[in-house]
Structures are given as C-alpha cells and as structure tokens.
Amino acid sequence: KEELAEKSDVLISCITSADGLLFEDERIFKPGITIIPVHMRGFQNCDTVFDRVFGDDTDHVKNFKYFGQFKDFNEIGEVLAGRDKGRKSQLQRILAYNYGLALHDVIFVSKIYELVSDRYDIRDIETNKPTDKFWI
C-alpha cells in the first residue's frame, strides 16, 4: 500500500474502521497529492503538516484533535462556490475531510469522472466488492 500512496496524485479512502494511522510516515505522500478520507479515519498524522485542509462543514471538524494546528483550513463549499481558489500551487498537499454529506459525495465523483472520462473507458474499470470491513 505504501507504493500506491507514494505514486498517487489523489488518494480516496472510504474505510469505516481504522486502528491508528494507515501510513505511519506522512512524508511518503508526494507534493501535489490530494487525500480524501471520506470517513476521516487513518490520516490524522497529515493534519498538521499538509498545506491545506478542507472540510465539508467546519462544525463537523472543529473538534478534531489537531483542528487548531491546520495550516490553512476552509470549507470545500467555498471552493465550489468560487470564493476560495482551492489549490494555490501544484506542490500543495491537500486533505479534504468529507464527512459524507451526500451532495459533496456526488460533486466529488462528478469532478473525478470529468477528469478521467476522456482518458479512460469508465466501463472498463474493474471494481471489486469488498470482503472485509477494512479496505482502501
């Protein structure tokens, strides 16, 4: 899994259970990566070192252990509304904590689809039903 993390531009995690961190050393994430831990587990070590952190709602994340130490926080809705630029440089490492609000889930999937649909035949992407409670 470390090799996957090291090479990824976008990493989306939808796990429902995590004991601790998924990746002990946050330095494996290259500049420019965006991590979207939908259920907000396993990436807390990135909270204080990533360049920007977004949440779908401040009230959902304001009690996070490291909330006061986020370098640059805003709500993802501000980006979608055009009031926040979002990524300010191609080197920024970004966390987007998505608590699972359905509207944001649909928007994320829509944007990802737009980015990949002209390069890949989406029907050819293999998906496997998870067999464990924990998966990436």
Q: Which stretches of residues belong to each language-model region?
A:
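Short acidic low-complexity segments
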Residues: 1-8, 23
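A short, aliphatic-rich alpha-helical micro-motif
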Residues: 4-6, 28-29, 47-48
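Short, well-ordered alpha-helix to beta-strand connector turns
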Residues: 8, 32-33, 49-52
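Short helix-capping and hinge/turn segments at secondary-structure transitions, especially at repeat
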Residues: 10-20
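Redox-cofactor binding/interface segments in oxidoreductases and associated redox assembly factors
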Residues: 12-13, 36-37, 55
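Short glycine-/small-residue-rich Rossmann-like dinucleotide-binding loops
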Residues: 15-17, 39-40, 58
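Glycine/threonine-rich flexible loop motifs
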Residues: 19-27
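Adenosine-phosphate binding glycine-rich loop
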Residues: 42, 46-136
